[in-house]
Amino acid sequence: MTGRVETADGKVYELPALLEWRLRRTGGVPCDSFRARCLYSAEMGEALKAACRFAATENGVTRFRGVIDEWSAVCGAEGAVLTVEGRGMAALLLDNEAEAVTYQRAALSEILKDHAAACGVAWEPRGEVYGTGEYAVASGSSRWKAIEGFARRCGLTPYFTREGVLCLRGAAEGRRLVLEEPEGVIEAWY
């Protein structure tokens, strides 16, 4: 597993070999989370001050992309170790409040533009979907709640991919997973 941090101005910095990592995927709420540890050197300090995103890749495939909540560098028995922690991209929608608004026959693209794009969240393109009647977003609601509420009215379920992209799927687009007493599995969820 390889870790990298990204700054708001688009610069990407590769982290040294990860000593430890934990990736927790939920796809929605509560949002995904991560923790990564690697050796720290003083040259990393400036990049880390501006770091806002983290990505973990394996064999060129993104396994996780999220928001950095905190980082710390500690000098101890293991040497100087950097710990980077945070949450999935859903955190941007959960942490930001929507303004009160009432839509008249809103389109999904309008809801996504108002609530996802405003937070810098990318979404998977799909055909246009229109709500029926009025759709109101209460003052103080999270942007996630604004999107999720509209999506569910339209028969869609919002979730985030491991690449940090917001997707909306209908019930017919899901997939069924069956576990028939697999040997050695103690716990499983999807």
Please identify what each model-predicted range represents:
Residues 1-47, 88-91:
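Juxtamembrane "anchor/assembly" segments of surface/extracellular structural proteins
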Residues 79-81, 85-91, 125-190:
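Short beta-strand-centered interaction patches in the first periplasmic/extracellular domains
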Residues 23-32, 73-80, 160-163:
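Short, ordered beta-strand-loop transition motifs
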Residues 39-122:
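Surface-exposed cap/loop segments at beta↔alpha junctions
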Residues 12-18, 64-69, 97, 104, ...:
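Short amphipathic beta-strand/extended segments with alternating polar/hydrophobic composition
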Residues 3-5, 34-36, 54-56, 68, ...:
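Hydrophobic beta-strand residues in large extracellular and virion-surface proteins
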Residues 1-2, 47-52, 152-154:
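A short, compositionally biased
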